[in-house]
Amino acid sequence: MPQHAMGDTHFLSLPKHLFTSTSSATDSGCDTPPSSRASPASLRSAHGTLGSSSQPLFEPQAEKRSSQTAREVQYVSSGPQNSLCGWQAFTPKCLQVFNTPKGFLFFLCAASFLQGMTVNGFINTVITSIERRFDLHSYQSGLIASSYDIAACLCLTFVSYFGGNGHKPRWLGWGVLVLGIGSLVFALPHFTAGRYEVEMDEGLGTGTCLTNQSHVECKDSASGLSNYRLIFMLGQLLHGVGATPLYTLGVTYLDENVKSSYSPIYIAIFYTAAILGPAAGYLIGGAMLNVYTEVGQRTELTTDSPLWVGAWWIGFLGTGIAAFLIAIPILGYPRQLPGSQRYVVMRAAETQQLKDHSRGAVSNPAFGKTVRDLPLSIWLLLRNPTFILLCLAGATEATLIAGMSTFGPKFFEAQFSLSASEAATLFGYLVVPAGGGGTLLGGFLVNKFKLRGSGIIRFCLFCTLTSLLAFFVFLMHCPNVHMAGVTTGYVGSLLPKGQLDLKAACNAIYCCQPKHYSPLCGSDGTMYYSPCYAGCPADAETDLGGQKVYRGCSCILEKASSGWGNATAGKCASTCQSKPFLLVLVFVVIIFTFLSSIPALTATLRCVSDRQRSFALGIQWIVVRTLGSIPGPIAFGWVIDKACLLWQDQCGHQGSCFVYENEAMSRYMLIAGLTFKVLGFLFFVAAYFLYKSPSVSSDGLEASLPSQSSASDSPTEQLQSNV
């Protein structure tokens, strides 16, 4: 900390700030006592004429004293502002107990929890079911997931720039309402697409083939279900518009209304709620997938069947209604919480050193009020190399998070031979402690060790390097379950990669339709495409567990005894020995990826000026979404499609993928993960070396600030600190 010797006393060197504050709440509500209001005459006598502006004023002034600069901070309280909690004139005193940072944090966490549960939980959980129900490819479902970020990018500049200088809680409340509308739109295809009907392959039957059967069924099945992806994209676009204020205006509103040392904790709690939302979405969504999509209708399908489609739409109806309920209290919060402006100078003291012309522009009280200042605001951020590098680092992390969160359940489903609901639930069990715990722990560590600027970036470097090393877990993979005609021949020989041969001597005389995909596990440990391709009779028994059992299947070699083989409907269980180790390292990747999220966000807030924080977060989210969240699901979906072995045949057109090659899927995940992790590490390294620490520390300044009550009630106060 720079010190200036003036006799036996050392003064803290600070820029001179003149700023105003709203009045604090009294015990009986948010009303300001008349005695605490400073008259204009008293202000003029104490400090001279300050003008009528009620906004924070930043007027750097230099005064030479014995060849040294002694600069002081003056605190000036403004006239009363409306800081009551309520709606228009309806501001009952019973509501003022919530008019605190903690009260606002509660409702903001509820909104972020709901957004995370909907966008990053339910959608990622049901994506496989939607592909199945509406005949979509993975890249098409990836485009649905990316539509959220596309809408956010289109709105971020407008929302962060004008919302940053406007009434933030109102922007947030209306955003949550739009989010709820998007959820209702997303559930709409279930009610307009008609009933989900599946033709089951029950076995050989009579064994007769109808020559015109395929043509008739193809003609009748041309329903254009894949066009419903446009409705899903519209719902996601509304989700993106509604969620845009949450992670820009919501974060800066918290940062503006709490002490700077507590800001990482508040933001970490907020982001932890946003992480726990997807976790709850995975768990609740997984449970909903165990309910048949046509609720109340009986079906012979089981949850283990690849043709099973769960009730994917129920969660979106619930979140749509909940969003309307959460938006109401958020709309009632004031522009500023009582006593918040006492933290302005503390935030300014922690800000990275800016160039003279940048500091002069943002110190103007009128800066950022009109659209004419928008080009200059963007230019000032583009000239900040630390900010740009942190944006690029965030984009690389967002690519992985978006891609893996969208297709993580599908990866588990393929590797461990699980049903869609089992895979979603397992992935949720990893996300709950790893994502939520990592986010909360990151903010706690920044506060615990008083990390500032360069120290925060060093911490991000450590987290990125650790998760990069853990990503080598994808060198491992679980072998594919042997599937006759797909991964292995009917006589046990291996098939050339990419070559399918479902016909064999044991089923050649029967009329087996490849569109009837209904896998079953034979007693020989091999999985078969359908009962017909396994040579099973039409009649099937039902065991005590409710599963269908086929006996006398001609293509299954019984190993325990001579005679015909048996088979059970559903996939064969995976015997992967490396499953526990793979899950542990995936947990490490997730926790260290999220461990750096709050520190990186805090570093972004500390490397730009106070007036540009909302706008800077908006620009950062544009970069993160444009380069990360939008291409992430699309790229990962395209990569996963490359690993497909068996496609659904929709009358000569590819439907969704039935079977993936596990080794190729792991290899592609490894290449993608290492590429983006290395880039992120390099961006953090460059940001560390280009970051310029502030010339004044905020540690000494914090002790010199008045208490919250005095900051709000005392009309005039000079702050000097001995060190």
Swiss-Prot record:
Keywords: Cell membrane, Disulfide bond, Glycoprotein, Ion transport, Membrane, Phosphoprotein, Transmembrane, Transmembrane helix, Transport. The modification Phosphoserine is found at residues 39, 42, 45. Pfam families: Kazal_2 (PF07648), OATP (PF03137). Glycans are attached at residues 212, 566. Residues 124-142, 195-224, 296-309, 403-422, 474-582, 641-673 are extracellular. GO terms for molecular function: organic anion transmembrane transporter activity; prostaglandin transmembrane transporter activity. Residues 23-64, 700-723 are annotated as: Disordered. GO terms for biological process: monoatomic ion transport; organic anion transport. One of its GO terms (cellular component) is plasma membrane. PROSITE patterns: KAZAL_2 (PS51465), MFS (PS50850). The keyword Metal-binding does not apply. It is found in: Cell membrane. Residues 33-46, 701-723 have a biased composition (Low complexity). Disulfide bonds join 506-536, 521-555. Residues 1-102, 164-169, 256-274, 335-380, 447-450, 606-614, 692-723 are cytoplasmic. Its main location: membrane. Belongs to the organo anion transporter (TC 2.A.60) family. A conserved histidine residue in the third TMD (His-190) may play an essential role in the pH sensitivity of SLCO4A1/OATP4A1-mediated substrate transport. This is Solute carrier organic anion transporter family member 4A1. It comes from Mus musculus (Mouse).
